[in-house]
Amino acid sequence: MTSGTHVAFASVLYLGGATLFGYKPDVVGWLLAATASLGPDVDLPTSKVGRLLFWLSVPLERRFGHRTVTHSAVGLLVVALVASPLWWVRPLYFWCVLGGTWSHLWIDMLNVRGADLFWPSPVRVVAPGNRNWRLEVGSKAEMVLLSVLLLLTVARTRPGHGTRYGAQTPMPSTAGRCRTHQCERGFREQ
């Protein structure tokens, strides 16, 4: 899948998780999930993260190939260990990194090739079972999926996140203070 599809899918899962689990979405968590959704492609030197971390990407691809160790439960465990300090800072951020990484593995299973989720086992996980329904990287079908994911992301974004009213969301209500302030200045509540 393309990096845009990975980021869009992680965004949908992050915002959907806010509804499901009741946490308040914030920009840091969203960025962590989106960034982590690109992480498993570190084993591909031509990917965005592979170009950034070329010193790690090239040896990983030579030794293991693409969609093997970094797209497996072993890779997910390594990410969990590396991200574990976030648990002590803010547990939600730990889950954002883990969820973003998992979203990458999950959506790559929709690809024709699938993912080696149980690496080093040769079992490859693909979905759906019908090969004709799987997606080619960069195909029209993937662009349709990307469009749907972007629409879902926009639909899940609450007003006040990135709009001109964005500053109102983090600010506490001043309704009680205004009444108190008005009463102190001699105004009587009717």
Predicted regions located by residue number:
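N-terminal membrane-targeting hydrophobic helices
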Residues: M1-Q190
